[in-house]
Regions:
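Glycine-rich catalytic cores of cysteine/serine-nucleophile enzymes that process amide/ester linkages
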Residues: 62, 73-172
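Selective detector of the "anchor" transmembrane alpha-helix that sits immediately C-terminal
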Residues: 13-21
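Active-site nucleophile-His-acid catalytic modules used for acyl/amide transfer and hydrolysis
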Residues: 157-200
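Alpha-helical transmembrane signal-anchor/signal-peptide segments
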Residues: 34-54
Length: 200
């Protein structure tokens, strides 16, 4: 009796260890494969991230080309519109930290930053995955960097309405307190990151 139980116990341990080794090796091969892939901008992207925004500077004025300004009537239904606009970073009045609770588990959320300007403009930055047509986002593959990184620049109306009206998510906004001049520095840093992604 005891000998058979010991044999069964160690058989289970060895089998579990073997399965774990096989799993880790498979994940490592997958990781190496994904790291060897070269990201690119010229692909058949889905409509909501079809264009990459580019920023250009002239003093405190920043010109933004390809800002998304969709009107959403559902999770996927929308009227496509991409605009070019200019903002003056000296006229930033507020920064809003946006938390999109997209899952029933409260700890899972997507975050964005919205910059409010004294001329009434609201520009939102959101780091997202860039998907090709027919490709679905998978959080597990996202952990292994299987998707191109995409910095979306959109009007706040677009970015928030997609989540509150289209996807029916709970969204919270918090005003960000920054030292003098840091709001402008943060906006410019995001634009620099935007341009660096556009060079890949």
């Amino acid at each position: 009796g005891k000998l058979l139980r010991d044999i069964a116990f160690w058989t289970m341990i060895l089998s579990g260890t073997a399965l774990l080794i096989i799993f880790v090796k498979a994940m490592w091969k997958r990781y190496v494969h994904l790291q060897s892939q070269i990201p690119g901008l010229e692909k058949n992207w889905v409509a909501d991230n079809a264009h990459h925004c580019i920023a250009s500077y002239k003093g405190s004025k920043v010109s933004l080309k390809n800002v998304r300004d969709f009107t959403w009537s559902g999770k996927r239904d929308h009227n496509s519109k991409w605009i070019d606009t200019s903002v003056d970073t000296d006229k930033i009045t507020d920064i809003w930290y946006v938390i999109d609770h997209f899952h029933k588990i409260k700890g899972l959320a997507h975050t964005m930053l919205t910059f409010e300007f004294s001329d009434g403009q609201f520009i939102t930055f959101s780091f997202e995955t860039r998907r090709e047509v027919g490709e679905r986002y998978d959080p597990w593959l996202g952990m292994w960097r299987a998707f191109e990184l995409y910095l979306l620049v959109a009007t706040e109306r677009d970015a928030l309405h997609l989540r509150t009206n289209g996807r029916k998510h709970k969204v919270h906004l918090y005003r960000v307190q920054t030292p003098p001049g840091k709001d402008k520095a943060l906006f410019n840093a995001l634009c620099d990151r935007l341009n660096s992604l556009g060079e890949n």
